[in-house]
Amino acid sequence: MKSTLRPALVLFAVLTLICGVIYPYAITGIGKLAFSEQAEGSLVSRNGQIVGSSLIGQAFSSPQYFWGRPSATSPMPNNAAASSGSNQGPLNLALIDSVKGRIAALKAADPANTLPVPVDLVTASASGLDPEISLAAAKYQAARIALARKMQLEEVQSIIDRHSKAQYFGFFGEPRVNVLALNLALDQHH
């Protein structure tokens, strides 16, 4: 028994050291060297104060700000620890009701807006934490924000254009914009 127990314990100790200590520290070190901002959470700070992460959406509800995608992490919106999609199918009555409610809220916030409501403003993403919205979703909200901030519509659209990102590799996804970056730019501008 001693002859089989000793190699098993040695193997256990060696693998614990490699997999539990050496590998995690090595990968963390490489990540911090190669991708220092991302390894630290892609935190965004303003005046020395951390205001969010560029990788995790935040809940904005003031008419003076761009609103992101709905969060699927309830009861706390945009809770990274509870990241997941809603798992509701397109025929699920709960999904249909929540989409109708979100459309009604968007229409109530900007009754003069006659544009079609972009789908990403009424449906959660697969992770439930998307920090970005489509350009259509940003432009849909531009008039409401301009009115609330007493800005020219062209100024808001210019901020959207300056912060827009192209498709990944020129063909994956669609042009998009980070909601936190837009809102910080609005605060800085006005």
Swiss-Prot record:
Keywords: ATP-binding, Cell inner membrane, Cell membrane, Ion transport, Membrane, Nucleotide-binding, Potassium, Potassium transport, Transmembrane, Transmembrane helix, Transport. GO terms for cellular component: plasma membrane. It is found in: Cell inner membrane. The chain crosses the membrane at residues 10-30. Disulfide bonds: none annotated. GO terms for molecular function: ATP binding; P-type potassium transmembrane transporter activity. Pfam families: KdpC (PF02669). InterPro entries: KdpC. The keyword Glycoprotein does not apply. It is a single-pass membrane protein. PANTHER family: POTASSIUM-TRANSPORTING ATPASE C CHAIN, POTASSIUM-TRANSPORTING ATPASE KDPC SUBUNIT. The system is composed of three essential subunits: KdpA, KdpB and KdpC. Belongs to the KdpC family. Part of the high-affinity ATP-driven potassium transport (or Kdp) system, which catalyzes the hydrolysis of ATP coupled with the electrogenic transport of potassium into the cytoplasm. This subunit acts as a catalytic chaperone that increases the ATP-binding affinity of the ATP-hydrolyzing subunit KdpB by the formation of a transient KdpB/KdpC/ATP ternary complex. This is Potassium-transporting ATPase KdpC subunit. It comes from Herminiimonas arsenicoxydans.
